[in-house]
Regions:
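Long, solvent-exposed, polar/charged low-complexity segments
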Residues: 12, 16, 20-21, 136-179
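Polyanion-binding interface signature
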Residues: 2-142
């Protein structure tokens, strides 16, 4: 099938024609369309010149959400803590560790994985505005778009099944407001 990554020679030609960004935008929109479903919300966009797409899964019973997000060679698992939940939960990194320990979120099962490999530059948690905590694996070079989409759909099913556990982790860790 068609490769998820463009060959470097193609990228150079596209850059020379100033078309790389346009083609990447179409590529990501195409991937988003193939993954779109009435069961969950998808999105795509651009940040700092790089295109990305993702799947948004609300964590029922909380005001926070979880995303699978793909940007370049990064396959991300991301918890988006709402300001409200952030205030109640305190140490978000500890919450992320508990989530990783007790659920499939943040777990990429890299053994015998034909799609993902460990990221060499992994930082434990990346945060934006200290609210979005993500961890990522790297998408392997030879992966086809079709195989990546199948992998994402399977991952979404596993994650959706574990979101109730995440809600329970939130509830167990909300700081008591009573003195």
């Amino acid at each position: 099938g068609e490769s998820y990554f463009f060959e470097e020679s193609i990228n150079k030609v596209l850059e020379g024609m100033r078309l790389r960004s346009v083609i990447e935008k179409i590529h990501y929109a195409n991937l988003e369309n193939k993954i779109a479903s009435s069961k969950y919300k998808t999105y795509s966009g651009r940040i700092r010149g790089d295109h990305f797409f993702g799947i948004y899964l609300p964590i029922e019973g909380t005001t926070s959400s979880f995303d699978i997000q793909i940007q370049g060679n990064q396959y991300r698992h991301k918890v988006n803590f709402s300001i409200e939940d952030k205030g109640k939960l305190g140490d978000l990194e500890r919450i992320c560790e508990i989530i990783k320990e007790k659920t499939c979120l943040y777990n990429f099962n890299l053994e015998d994985n034909s799609i993902l490999e460990k990221s060499s530059s992994r930082k434990k948690w990346k945060t934006y505005g200290k609210q979005d905590y993500y961890d990522y694996a790297r998408i392997k070079k030879q992966v086809s778009s079709k195989d990546l989409i199948v992998y994402i759909r399977t991952d979404v099913k596993k994650i959706k099944a574990d979101l109730q556990k995440v809600k329970n982790i939130f509830l167990e860790n909300i700081k008591s407001t009573t003195k």
